[in-house]
UniProtKB/Swiss-Prot annotation:
This protein binds to 23S rRNA in the presence of protein L20. This is Large ribosomal subunit protein bL21. The keyword Iron does not apply. Keywords: Ribonucleoprotein, Ribosomal protein, RNA-binding, rRNA-binding. It comes from Afipia carboxidovorans (strain ATCC 49405 / DSM 1227 / KCTC 32145 / OM5). Part of the 50S ribosomal subunit. Contacts protein L20. It comes from the Bacteria. GO terms for molecular function: rRNA binding; structural constituent of ribosome. Residues 105-164 are annotated as: Disordered. Signal peptide: none annotated.
């Protein structure tokens, strides 16, 4: 089953588990949002909306909020010494489509559980592995004073004799 949704002035064809980068929408990372502007639903019996399907929505989980790439708008009018450089970065929300809903149904799938970080098991003896001493840093500190050793004063040039 697929759906065509409209968000941020753009249209997307989505299926469950799709990951999309769309214009910024409000919500915290990990929450489920419903996108209500569904233009078409496909599957066994395709349905088209005029312009949207009543009661249909797409549930999606917010994965991240970030900024898009830099876009630079440079305008130059030749031979007039006139130019303008402006730039911007769009705010982007990364979402994962969880399910496509019809008939005003509520989302049944909640946000995914976060993966736990693997914790290294401590040795059974209770001894922690020994860490190497930072020998390179100590050597670098000793080398710096030697390099800044005594410096001979600069000699001045002798004045030139005038010829008559």
């Amino acid at each position: 089953m697929f759906a065509v949704i409209k968000t941020g002035g753009r249209q997307f064809r989505v299926v469950p588990n799709d990951v999309l980068e769309i214009g910024k929408i409000t919500g915290d990372v990990g929450t489920i949002v419903q996108l209500g502007e569904v233009m078409a639903v496909g599957g066994d019996t395709p349905v088209l909306g005029f312009p949207f399907i009543e009661g249909a929505s797409v549930a999606a989980e917010i994965l991240d909020h970030k900024r898009g790439p830099k876009v630079i708008a440079f305008k130059k009018r030749r031979r007039k010494n006139s130019k303008r450089k402006r730039g911007y970065r769009d705010e982007i929300t990364v979402i994962r489509v969880t399910e496509i809903l019809t008939d005003d149904k509520a989302p049944t799938i909640g946000p995914r559980a976060k993966k736990e970080k693997k914790v290294e098991a401590a040795p059974a003896d209770g001894e922690a592995p020994a860490k190497k001493a930072p020998a390179k840093k100590a050597a670098a500190k000793k080398a710096a004073p030697k390099a800044a050793a005594k410096k001979a004063p600069a000699k001045k040039a002798a004045p030139k004799a005038k010829s008559e």
